[in-house]
């Protein structure tokens, strides 16, 4: 044996397998339902478990409706958008998620005033019991900057805040 497994993952799409691989066993329906219902959108990660998260823009990795349903399953009540193109407020309202927009140009940093304003808003929303997800396009650059800013706002030193946000 060469250390490779010749059996594909259950539920693997046939078009993703090479010609020599056997067909994948279908994932049982209960397992499919559980897998879909037990996680947030792809790339969704908690900074503060159950309170504050980062995520890619809903609809950028998967179907918009699926991503919004996944955010709702995770308990998200407010989506903070950092993209210049606004989210569809009607789609968010349809699943009961509020929306805050604070556009930051892609590959740019927020101004100090904008970062501080967002931190104040996040603190207020958390104090009111909101569960927040912050997003930009990929959920990395602008999202990570705001999440690190929030940690600094809480009193963490900058290096620790950056390292923590990078893990998200």
Predicted region positions:
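Conserved G/P- and acidic residue-centered "switch" motifs that form tight phosphate/ATP-binding loops
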Residues: 139
């Amino acid at each position: 044996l060469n250390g490779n497994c010749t059996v594909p993952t259950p539920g693997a799409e046939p078009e993703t397998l090479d010609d020599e691989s056997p067909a994948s066993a279908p994932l049982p329906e209960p397992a499919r339902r559980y897998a879909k219902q037990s996680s947030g959108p792809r790339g969704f990660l908690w900074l503060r478990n159950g309170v504050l998260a980062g995520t890619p823009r809903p609809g950028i990795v998967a179907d918009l409706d699926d991503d919004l349903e996944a955010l709702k399953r995770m308990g998200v009540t407010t989506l903070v958008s950092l993209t210049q193109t606004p989210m569809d407020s009607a789609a968010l309202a349809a699943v009961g998620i509020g929306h805050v927009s604070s556009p930051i140009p892609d590959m740019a940093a927020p101004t100090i005033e904008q970062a501080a304003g967002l931190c104040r808003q996040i603190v207020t929303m958390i104090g009111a019991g909101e569960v927040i997800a912050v997003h930009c396009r990929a959920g990395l650059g602008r999202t990570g900057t705001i999440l690190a800013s929030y940690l600094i706002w809480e009193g963490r030193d900058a290096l620790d805040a950056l390292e923590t946000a990078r893990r998200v």
